[in-house]
UniProtKB/Swiss-Prot annotation:
InterPro entries assigned: CB, DNA_brk_join_enz, Integrase-like_cat_sf, Integrase_catalytic, Integrase_recombinase_N, Integrase_SAM-like_N, Tyrosine_recombinase_XerCD
Function of the protein: Site-specific tyrosine recombinase, which acts by catalyzing the cutting and rejoining of the recombining DNA molecules.
Family matches, as Pfam families: Phage_int_SAM_4, Phage_integrase
Residue span(s) of domain Tyr recombinase: 125-313
Entry keyword set: Cell cycle, Cell division, Chromosome partition, Cytoplasm, DNA integration, DNA recombination, DNA-binding, Plasmid
Subcellular location: Cytoplasm
Organism taxonomic ancestry: Bacteria, Pseudomonadati, Pseudomonadota, Betaproteobacteria, Burkholderiales
Domain Core-binding (CB): start-end pairs: 17-108
Keyword field contains Cell inner membrane: no
Designated name of the protein: Tyrosine recombinase XerC 2
PANTHER family in the cross-refs: PHAGE INTEGRASE-RELATED, TYROSINE RECOMBINASE XERC
Length: 347
């Protein structure tokens, strides 16, 4: 048997195109200025899709791309249907077009084209979706209680779950925490290179710190096999990954019998919603969650339906009048008949 030779690198079928060369130059500039490889990877998918569309229509040079061309592409995305017949969501259309605006802005700034054809291109308006599910306080406590602190990995998981719920940090952020990023004395955690490559400081609750302290003293020394800076390590002593964090949360959700979609982000949503219900200002939540725009945080002002219903029942004049009617001096049968009639009227 012949020894296996070196693996051949796949040839990029778009490499010979002029548009591709300008795309790669753009991405190199983004990396130099501090954009993450993940951001570049996501934008490459969108711009390559546009380049393929251009090649099919004989559009070869950046200067050939006009506003009319971009609007044609926008209509193409709007009418495009996936293999299952479903259209692209507005979010997907926005995600496909936004990198093009950035790319052509760069091309114009670097004098590769005379003007920016995307400057007046209107992007689809992104809908503001409510989180699909919100955990109640009782459900969060049930999830936390499933981690068994009698075992090293269970104690690690309890500390990790408590930290997620206490701070609302993302799974990639908890995976990126180092030992020196938690200041127990000042009750703070330093989130480095969070979403958007931004650092921030978040407070950590007393209960979460107590579990972290137990983990560091009792569990982590049993899990590590070599010196590691990572705060949380796997059963084999390696730094946890974002996917590992999510899998642990999902595991304890299943143990607690909670079937709601999501994992780590559910704890983030729960933290924001529960704090808002308790009176936290939305701008405080914006800082805690690391949202660049306030309107991203304001979605949480709409999510607590049960809380809104309770307040409505307790304070709305019509509801109070109904209770007065039902409490009036009447027979039990008459009161029940009146209540049934009111319920039918409300329906």
């Amino acid at each position: 048997m012949k020894p296996a030779g070196p693996r051949k690198r796949a040839v990029d079928p778009l490499a010979h195109l002029v548009l591709t060369r300008y795309m790669e130059a753009h991405f190199e500039a983004l990396l130099v200025t501090g954009y993450s490889a993940d951001t570049v990877r996501a934008r490459r998918i969108s711009i390559r899709r546009f380049i393929v569309w251009c090649e099919e229509r004989g559009i070869a040079q950046p200067a050939d791309v006009t506003r009319a061309v971009l609007e044609r592409y926008q209509r193409h995305l709007f009418y495009y249907r996936k293999p299952n017949g479903a259209p692209l969501t507005l979010g997907s259309q926005h995600g496909a077009l936004a990198p093009l605006k950035t790319w052509f802005k760069w091309l114009a700034r670097e004098n590769h084209i005379l003007y920016n054809p995307a400057s007046e291109l209107d992007l689809p308006k992104l809908p503001k979706h409510l989180p699909r599910a919100i955990l109640s306080v009782q459900e969060v406590e049930a999830i936390l209680a499933e981690a068994d602190p009698a075992t090293p990995y269970g104690l690690r998981d309890r500390a990790m779950l408590e930290l997620l719920y206490s701070t609302g940090i993302r799974r990639m952020e908890v995976a990126g925490l180092a030992l020196y990023d938690v200041d127990a004395t000042r009750r703070l955690a330093f989130v480095r290179d969070g979403k958007g490559a931004k650092d921030r400081v978040v407070p950590v609750g007393v209960r979460a710190l107590a579990w972290l302290d137990r983990y560091l003293l009792e569990a982590r020394p049993q899990l590590i096999v070599a010196e590691r800076e990572a705060l949380f390590v796997t059963d084999y002593g390696e730094p946890v990954s974002p996917e590992y964090v999510a899998s642990r949360v999902k595991r304890y959700m299943e143990f607690a019998g909670i079937q709601k979609p999501g994992a780590t982000h559910l704890l983030r949503h729960a933290m924001a919603t529960h704090m808002l219900e308790a009176g936290a200002d939305v701008r405080v939540l914006q800082a805690l969650l690391g949202h660049a725009q306030l309107n991203t945080t304001e979605i949480y002002t709409h999510v607590s339906i049960e809380h809104l219903r309770a307040i409505h029942d307790a304070t709305h004049p019509a509801r109070l009048q109904r209770e007065d009617v039902l409490a009036a001096d009447a027979t039990d049968a008459a009161r029940q008949a009146l209540a049934d009639a009111l319920d039918r009227d409300e329906g």
